[in-house]
Amino acid sequence: IDYTSGTTGEPKGVEYTGRGAYLNALGQALDAGLSSTSTYLWTLPMFHCNGWCYTWAVTAVGGTHVCLKHVNPDEVFLLVARHSATHMCAAPSVLTMLEASRMVSEGALSGVKIFTGGAPPAPRVLRAMQSMGAELHHLYGLTETYGPSTIAAVQQDWAGMSIEDQARMKSRQGVPVTTLHVGVRVVADDMGDVPMDAETIGEVVARGNTVMAGYYRDPKASASAFQGGWFHTGDLAVVHPDGYIELKDRKKDVIISGGENISSVEVEKMLMEHPAILEACVVGVPDEMWGEAPKAFVTLRDGYKVTPIEIINFCRERLAHFKAPREVKFGPLPKTATGKIQKYVLREQEWSGHDRKIG
C-alpha cells in the first residue's frame, strides 16, 4: 500500500501488486536506458510512488544508487561531478532549485539524463537544463499508476528546432511508457477517443498491469475511479497529431470565469516566464461579477522585486485578458513532502466562508 501525496485532498491508500511493481521496474529500466554502468542520484523521495520503482529498477540492472538525505541544489552538482551520475529523477521544484543555484554553469549536468514529473515543467526550466547539458525527459503519472505512465520521448527531428520549440515539445506529457503501450487514452464523456487535433479536450484514462488494484478500504472511491473499466485520472488533456498527449489541467483546477474556461496550468506557465518569479500557482477565487477569477500565488527569486500590477500586466500582454490573474499574492507556497504544490490548500483558504465553489 502506497499513499497518494495529497495535492488534491486527503491522501488515499493505493493498493499495489507484486506483478505491477515488478513490471513497472523493468519498464523504467528500459525507458530510462539503465544498465550496470548507470549511477542514479536520488533527489526523489523513495516513499513517493515507491520512488517511481527506481529503487528496484536500478538494483535490477546492477546500477549504483547515490542517496541524498536532504535536497540541496549545491550538493546535487557536487555529487553529479564526484560520482559521474548518469541518471536522476526530480520534481519541477527541484529543477527550479538547481536553476537558481549559485553553482549553475554551462555543462554542469553534461550527460545526465533527468526525468521530471508531478507538474508540467516551465519552458524556462527546460531551457536552463539544456544549457547545463542535461538530457531532460518529461514524465507523467500518478501514485495509482506506480509512477510514470507516459514519457515525452525525444524525437531526432527535434534537434533542428529552436530551443523555444524544443521546450514546447518536451513540456508535453508524451506517449505511453513501455508497460502501458496500449493502456493510456484521452477520452470524451462517452469514453470515445478524442481526435488527434491538439484542441479537443478529454480525460486521461489508463488500464493495464501497472495500474493500481484499488483504494485501500475505500470501495466507493475505487468504483468511482474505475468507471467503464478504465482508471480515470481526473486530468484533462489533448492529443497532438503526432500522438503526444498534453495536459491542460485537472478537472478540479479548471477556473470558470464568466462562462469562460481558464486553464490554471496555462497561466502558471506564463507566470514562470517572468524573470523575477521562482514558483507560481494559480487557483480560482470568488468574484462577485464573474463567479470566480484567477488569483496567482508566487514566490520571488532572491534579490528580485516586482509589484502585483507588473505581474498582472506581464500576463495581460501575453494572454487573453480574461486569463490574466486579477490578484497576486507573494509568499511561500504550501507543499507536500515530495515538493508538490498543494493547490487545494490555497483554494480552501480563498473559499472559506463562501456558500459554494464554482468549477
Predicted regions and their residues:
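Conserved AMP-binding/adenylation subdomain of ANL enzymes
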Residues: Y22-T39, F47-H87, S101-R102, G183
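Acidic/polar alpha-helix N-cap and adjacent early helical turns
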Residues: Q349-G359
